[in-house]
Amino acid sequence: MARSKSQKIEGCSFCGRTRAEAEGKIISAKSVAICFECSKICHNLFKEESDKPASNKAPRGLPTPKQLKSHLDKYIIGQEDAKKVLSVAVYNHYKRIFKGSKRETGVELEKSNVLLVGPTGSGKTLLAKKLAAEMNVPFAIADATTLTEAGYVGEDVENILLKLIHAANGDVSFAERGIIYIDEIDKIAKKGENVSITRDVSGEGVQQSLLKIIEGTIANVPPRGGRKHPYEETIAINTHDILFICGGAFVGLENIIKKRINRSFIGFSSSSCKDTGGDNSLKYLEMEDLIKFGLIPEFVGRLPVHSYLDKLEKKDLMKILVEPENSIVRQYYHMFKMDNVDLLFEKDALDAIAEEAMLKNTGARGLRSILEELLKDVMFEIPSSKQIKKVIVTKDSVLNTNVEPLILTGRHVNKPWAKELYEINSKSN
């Protein structure tokens, strides 16, 4: 029998509380009623949904590859090929997620994970990090050298996914659209081309373990990390839309490439051969070279997009010190400015810092440690002294550990200064 329009609803349609139990706090409309407590639950659910990061949904407009590269240009010096390749790969990856459903296209678009090959300190990690920040997606870094095959002492590959979940503040659906950078991937190469009698638990075994999560699977991740236990609850995460970027130095890979190219051109004139002189042989990288190096074919197949990074020269390191928006020199300048102290560098000092990084063969990564060591005593003194107004890093202080940067108690620097000074431009002030 239908309820008459005038008939009053006596209880909450959701929880069943009567008007008396709800202390009269019930709102009704037509044939439905809701109590105050249930309305609060609904309000909180809607609020949680609206508070979710915008990246959980399709963005209004994906940055184009040119826009992504332009963003990378602000932070990374050189490495043009890697910046272009990564910009296209990231654009295509998220275009595939937000616009390329099989229902709409009739075609299932497979994801294209990326492999970056280049020396230590050439910018592999920074490229991935800056792209993730620009896309506003969670980002995690993993070290392949800590991973071992399941059942052995070490870290399970699923722990990589836990780092991404943490980066997404526990939001699994947000993490499922993130980016993972696996560093030192060359360190899990097989020990040799032939399978060893002994178990290679940190080489081929890890590659086999990584295959599924890189390709796309539902992985069960222990919430506290470590090894999985039979009765422990796990977090299920779909890796189908997670972009994996793997990087490594691959020492010796250039020789493999050169041997292959030379073998291919036996019998041809030297003028018809590819020029592999200098450090450019990595641009001719092919799958067979990676397999020869020690990566298994199945693993190489999951990383179809390749790019190379050049070894940084002294002139590149000089630019890295001062040119990017968040250059190392600019960071230290602002750090000193927080204590009301001006930081200046002799141009010869910047040259000496770049030269030292070259000698240590640490690339851009070594620049910060050189500056930290150089300025540590000054940074120790500044917070306790109101007299220090200006610090000048000289060439002598870089080259000689017994010479400290010059400390001035007044803002004025005598002119002409014996050495040319580099001063942070007004853009960074």
UniProtKB/Swiss-Prot annotation:
Binding site for ATP: 119-126
Domain ClpX-type ZB: 1-54
Parts forming coiled coils: none
CDD domains named among the record's database cross-references: RecA-like_ClpX (cd19497)
Cellular component GO terms held in the UniProt record: HslUV protease complex
GO biological process, one term: cell division
Molecular functions (GO terms): ATP binding; ATP hydrolysis activity; ATP-dependent protein folding chaperone; protein dimerization activity; unfolded protein binding; zinc ion binding
Residues at which Zn(2+) binds: 12, 15, 35, 38
Keyword terms: ATP-binding, Chaperone, Metal-binding, Nucleotide-binding, Zinc
Pfam entry (one): zf-C4_ClpX
Record SMART domains: AAA, ClpB_D2-small, zf-C4_ClpX
Entry-linked InterPro entries: AAA+_ATPase, ATP-dep_Clp_protease_ClpX, ATPase_AAA_core, Clp_ATPase_C, Clp_protease_ATP-bd_su_ClpX, ClpX_bact, P-loop_NTPase, Znf_CppX_C4
Family: Belongs to the ClpX chaperone family.
Annotated function: ATP-dependent specificity component of the Clp protease. It directs the protease to specific substrates. Can perform chaperone functions in the absence of ClpP.
HAMAP family, per database record: ClpX
Subunit structure and binding partners: Component of the ClpX-ClpP complex. Forms a hexameric ring that, in the presence of ATP, binds to fourteen ClpP subunits assembled into a disk-like structure with a central cavity, resembling the structure of eukaryotic proteasomes.
Entry protein name: ATP-dependent Clp protease ATP-binding subunit ClpX
Lineage of source species: Bacteria, Pseudomonadati, Spirochaetota, Spirochaetia, Spirochaetales
